Amino acid sequence: MAADKACAVVLRDRGVLDILAFEHPLAGLQLVKGSVEPGESSGAAAVRELMEEAGIQATAKRNLGEWHSTITGHIWAFHECEVAQDLPDSWVHFAEDDGGHDFRFFWHPLMSEPSDRWHHIFKDALSFLRASLA
């Protein structure tokens, strides 16, 4: 079965490996992810979602594998995305999702346990990524 969700993984290494994450004003802390549209590859979907949710242009650099969420039944494809510019420590991007929201972006230390502010599905996704990138 093909992946129906794509997750854009943007990493930075400043002595600690960080992953790009954001705070959704209604749904807590999350990773950039969304649905794969008909005829779209999961890598292209990850790049598109990164532009829509974060305003970042990127290229899909590396496929990090697929994960089946037992919570939702969706299959997620993780793609490491490379961005051309240096990204700040934090910023806010207005995303058009669900009528429009300000998403607050930040860097989460990948090997740190996520707090209770993360939805359980994203905690599980981070566990998958920690194992994949270890």
Name each region found by the language model.
Residues Q57-G65:
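A short coil-to-beta-strand element that immediately follows conserved catalytic motifs
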Residues G15-E52, I56:
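Conserved Nudix-box catalytic region and its N-terminal flanking loop in Nudix hydrolases
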Residues S35, W67-H68:
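Structured beta->alpha junctions
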Residues D13-R14, H68-T70:
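Short polar/acidic secondary-structure junctions
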Residues V10-L11, A21, C81, W107:
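Conserved hydrophobic "DFG−1" position in protein kinase catalytic cores
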Residues S69-P114, I121-L133:
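Active-site-adjacent beta-strand/loop module that shapes the phosphate/pyrophosphate-binding cleft
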Residues M1-I19:
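Conserved N-terminal beta-strand and adjoining loop/helix that marks the start
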